[in-house]
């Protein structure tokens, strides 16, 4: 309920154990929602979505693919911040676009609000899911609860992990209720996801984050750092 509220409401949450599992859930949901024949997920070069075979295939870093090739089919990569390239990659086989609000492993590249809005527009026009991978950026780290909240967009699916359990292994995949309804009984499950220990840790973590206004503190720290950097010659 807390996560759904922080994401604007109207969604459902599936708990897992790691960011990769949350992204696997999101991409399986996209295929189930879109139906047979629409199995391709588009991501960007420089992205990082996990180390399982599917999330590694979605990761847009060919050097990471080499030792484990061939990669599973169904993943397509486009240039970062290039809406024209993204549009050209969308055909009748695509079900979703997965994007990080800030690329971490790709070199710390923030997505401009206009870029995220453009992705939302393309997803609406082509009937695709917009998946936000907030594993690294979520839960206050960017000055908002989630990185996409710096832009005027409403994703269909949001994944998160890392900060959620404050060191305890828990992740979550949030989806709009009408999207989550695509999963049928038996489609997706986990043995340890959502167990009492980890969810209690996540609930306590979120309570502290809200009580101490972690997003506000991140905004303040970011402003101090930006101000100091701007005083340096040549920066």
What are these model-derived regions, one by one?
Residues 1-235:
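Conserved N-terminal phosphate-binding loop of PLP-dependent enzymes in the Aspartate aminotransferase
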């Amino acid at each position: 309920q807390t996560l759904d509220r922080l994401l604007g409401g109207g969604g459902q949450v599936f708990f897992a154990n790691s960011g990769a599992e949350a992204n696997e859930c999101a991409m399986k949901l996209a295929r189930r929602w879109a139906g047979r024949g629409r199995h391709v997920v588009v991501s960007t070069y420089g992205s990082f979505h996990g180390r399982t075979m599917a999330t590694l295939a979605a990761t847009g870093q060919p050097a990471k693919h080499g030792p484990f090739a061939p990669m599973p089919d169904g993943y397509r990569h486009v240039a970062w911040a290039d809406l024209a390239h993204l549009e050209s990659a969308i055909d009748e086989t695509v079900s979703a676009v997965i994007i990080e609000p800030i690329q971490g492993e790709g070199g710390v590249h923030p997505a401009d609000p206009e870029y995220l809005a453009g992705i939302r527009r393309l997803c609406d026009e082509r009937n695709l899911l917009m998946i936000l991978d907030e594993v690294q950026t979520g839960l206050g780290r960017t000055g908002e609860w989630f990185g996409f909240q710096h832009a005027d967009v409403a994703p269909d699916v949001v994944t998160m992990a890392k900060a959620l359990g404050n060191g305890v292994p828990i992740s979550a995949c949030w989806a709009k209720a009408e999207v989550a309804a695509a999963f049928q009984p038996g489609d997706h499950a986990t043995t340890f996801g959502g167990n009492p220990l980890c969810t209690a840790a996540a609930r306590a973590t979120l309570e502290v984050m809200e009580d101490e206004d972690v997003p506000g503190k991140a905004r303040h720290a970011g402003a101090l750092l930006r101000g100091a950097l701007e005083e340096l010659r040549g920066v």
